[in-house]
Amino acid sequence: MNKFYLYLLVFIAAIVLSCSKEKASDHVNLIETNVHHGRTEDYSESRNLYFGDLHVHTGWSFDAYMAKVRVTPDQAYKFAKGEPIPHISGKEVKMNRPLDFMAVADHAEYMGGLMQMQEEGNALYNWDLAQSIRSKDDDESKKATRKLRFSIATNWPYKQLIDKQNLQYTWKKMVEIADAHYEPGKFTSFPAYEWTSSVAVLKSLISGPPYAQNLHRNVIFKGGKVSGLPFSSFDSQNPEDLWEWMANQRNQGVELLAIPHNANISDGRMYALNTFDGDKLTAKYIETRLRNEPVNEVVQIKGQSMAHPLLAPKDEFADFEVYQYSLGQGNNRKKLKTEGAYVRQAFKNGLAIHQKFGQNPFQFGIIGSTDSHNGGPNVEENNNIGRSGTKDINAEHRLRKDKGGEVTRKTSVAGLAAVWAKENTRESIYEALERKEVYATSGPRIQLRFFASEDWQNVDFDNEKWDSLAYHNGVPMGSQISKGEVSPSFLISAVKDVDGANLDRAQVIKGWIDQEGQTHERIYDVAWSEGRSMDSEGNLPLVGNTVNIENATFTNDIGAISLQTFWSDPDFNPKFSSFYYIRVLEIPTPRWTTFDAVSLGVEVPDDVPSSIQERAWSSPIWYEPIN
């Protein structure tokens, strides 16, 4: 591109972006949705475990549509319930096991717009750009598609695609579809959308398309009253503006929360120690972030954001599904910063911020979800339906040898949100998210409990009501404790996925801050399968590996069905603020790339692991000294 035109383009974009404009989401009537009254048949005071996905895209998202995905939100909910749906490959696809809850969270930006371009009679059908996108001339169609992508990357939208009336119609349909699939006690569907703040690094235009720093959030509505229109990144790319809009919605009776995801590809901005504009943190900023973002999504198709080997060099299990490719730039994606991009480091930095402000902006719970752009959750390694239409349409395409294949192979088949709630309703699951009694898995349905107490004298795992007693005697994951000159006692219970692999070990991951303001971390193996013992250095041998790469199988000859224990911190200091969370590892199982290779009768790729240890991570329990 000629540099003169490049600079001119950036200059014009800056002027346009600086212009004040009425937000598309302003002055729109609220939408009334279904509210459940009374208890469902599955109600339990000691809470049930539900697995779901709060991040699924359909053909109503611009990027999914451009990848030839035509699945609708209605079909996506049917897929989550266990019904087959059409796939871009021409085949039908189906989950091995249905989910308990789900949210279709299509991008607010251009929501449904590309779908409307294909509908004769729609106002967008005869638009010049729509005609170019529909063109049978492949070059013309690709050029038009690039224009759309560029408009989003630079946050310079086409006015035809942000028409308030069109958006209102599409969003109302989205909410109505979620309502139609809501079956209290059986399946919960949430009205939701994705706020897609992708901050373009325009200097990259000199060498190619811009890359973007991912600051995306999924906005989940409890139900009852729902906003009349979503607040999109076209309204603002600044999370603080999103939070302000959310506060205004609450003033009108709307209950909603935001869930950040993919900190790993934020280029260090998701958990930065300053604001979006580069200013220092303030007490108001911290309080507002805490109020609006009680949980973060930490594992999905674009990898995990829990830990990175560069930030946790002593953690032998940190190098798991690491994905650091930027958004944009096609297949020439740059690798991104790790500082400010991973949860464990954020948890530690949060302790330091708490020392100064008395509040911690990173005191959030964690979940997994998929971010599937195929209209259905993709969490089963042996049943990979791909992540985004033509980008990875089938096994042959996913294992291709070019740069695009390399990037695709680094993606994951993951993850799930696990929620402890009294019943399968919007109200109960939403409240679990707010109190952070939730956890993340990379896909398996591992059952994980984590409690803290001063005294477990009445709790015994042999008592079938031990979980009820645990709530009576202690507090669950997501809580904060403050008492004690001695370590609190932690209750940990992990049970394998009934259809999955045995368990290797359960670990407590601790972070703390000392009196000099230095943060630290340590990992404790606290329960493990039989046949091993810890050495004098405190190291536990690996569990072994039964994976047969030639036929993509494994056996449960090693590992444990369940791991249960009580544990107290041997290094506890009552003066130090700290956090504790659980990581449960399965025994090794074949990765999706191995299943793909075996299905094709080709060599297993050597640029990714042939087997992985799937896992679950609990939300933390925080300890704060009383003073």
Model-derived segments and their meaning:
Residues 16-18:
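C-terminal motif of bacterial Sec signal peptides marking the signal peptidase cleavage site
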Residues 20-73, 77, 84-126, 133-134, ...:
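C-terminal functional module detector
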Residues 162-171, 210-214, 220, 234-259:
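Cap/lid and interdomain-hinge subdomains that line or gate substrate/regulatory clefts
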Residues 1-8:
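Bacterial N-terminal signal peptides that target proteins for export
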